[in-house]
Amino acid sequence: PYNHLFASGALDIIGFNYHDDWFMGVPTNFPGMPFIVTESVSGLMTRGYYRMPSDEPVVCPERWDRPYYDPSFSCSSYDNCRVPWGNHHEGTLKLVQNNDFISGQYIWTGFDYIGEPTPYGWPARSSYFGIVDLAGFPKDVYYMYQSQWTDKDVLHLFPHWNWEEGQDMDLWAYYNNADEVELFINGKSQG
């Protein structure tokens, strides 16, 4: 995006919030300038809540000025729910990792917080943005970041195993830093 302050050359580093579609214009519009994503992602999730199908993206609210409504007041933890101006965690992380001109990112947010209830209006009272919930428990996507930025072994399986008999769910052995993972359920390989 064009910005008089950026264009003046007065800054040693540039950055902007969200809008991953703008990232690729940085090397052309600001050649040689270090760039950091100053506020990124805005993925929405409720720890322990899984909406099927897991690969169906949800943008909510569809517009920032119209609160989203779902009677559960929950957002799926499959990293498939985001606000219109943001992206899913995995999507932005891939952009950062695959483009050398991006120095890094600040994720919005580390923790859920009271106030700015998004995507729901009243009676919701908090955000759903954090990779850690209000009680301090990591959400599933926390382990995605951990698997990318630590030397210790990481393998995170989800969702929980508290389903009703016959209820469909997608099991992910997705957040890991192993060369390969094979999942067995009751002695049978799932791949």
Residue ranges and their predicted role:
Residues 1-191:
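Extended substrate-binding grooves/exosites of carbohydrate-active enzymes
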